[in-house]
Amino acid sequence: MQRYPTKQIKIRDVAIGGDAPIPVQSMTFSKTKDVKGTLAQIQRLYFAGCDIVRCAVLDKEDAKALREIVAKSPLPVVADIHFNHIYAVMVSEYVDAIRINPGNIGSKERIKAVVDACKQRKIPIRIGVNSGSLEKQFEERYGRSVEAMVASAMYNINLLEDFDFTDIKISLKSSDVERTMQAYRTLRPKVPYPFHLGVTEAGTTFHATIKSAIALGGLLLEGIGDTMRVSITGELEEEIKVAKAILKDSGRQREGLNIISCPTCGRLQSDLMKAIKIVEEKTKHIKEPLNVSVMGCVVNAIGEAKGADVAIAFGKESGLIMRRGEVVARLKESELVDRFLAEIDDEIKSRE
């Protein structure tokens, strides 16, 4: 499905919305005042393929530290502000964007002060609605519901528009998958601004992957979403790995290998698991979009190979290498993986 048309904004040099690719975001978990530690985490995210990073601003020391962090960061930096609007005004001088939580940022006057500062610097604001920290007026009226989340978003969007500010990005996050999806779906036709997708407090890698694949993948397939973060209680790199997989498998990003492999059964007569692990490790650096197939027997291997750029069909102590369904080699099992990797390299070179 085509993406919903949205206004395009920029965070440093990264475009969000319109027809721009969907950037992947993450957040450091170091104390932001620890400049060295925070920059080390940003560097890890950069090499993992992250596009935008967010840093928490808990106090004045964090706010001051961001100046040096932004200057040295290879990624655009978003300041994550809760409770104290003064920090937002302070860091607006040097960060690339501001995220405010409408549930705790305070009065109209405080929001206007943030808007005025961002307007002067020409940096965007994310209205980051979270079902766990809604404004009292909306939670009392609607409970912690989709209606409350959407009402909060609309109120704050209208407020920023009243202040003549439209460099806006919106998120509506909940730890509940269905509530998250319904909130984004409900708001999407009402506003022209880009959406930042995410399931908040999604848990450890396994649970966060499942929740995010359902919610974010489902929304992307419906054409909703302009940037995203997969929130994981775990290693930073896992967030980027999962996010990129969701983008690829939802058809929103064509980058790297799409590896098709069978779940194995009693017909298996080779060490397919070992082969898959080697292939994944040896090809993780590849950016070229390729379909490759690694199958344990010939039952489905020939059919899958027709749709693959390069394929293996394992047999008993031997197997086939195929290019677009055509057999190019019959080899011993011990030779298959090396030849398969060589054929992948050759396929990439043929496209240069």
Curated annotation (Swiss-Prot):
HAMAP family: IspG. Gene3D superfamilies: Dihydropteroate synthase-like, Sulfite Reductase Hemoprotein, domain 1. Its EC number is 1.17.7.3. This is 4-hydroxy-3-methylbut-2-en-1-yl diphosphate synthase (flavodoxin). Binds 1 [4Fe-4S] cluster. Keywords: 4Fe-4S, Iron, Iron-sulfur, Isoprene biosynthesis, Metal-binding, Oxidoreductase. The gene is ispG. It is an enzyme of class 1 (oxidoreductase).
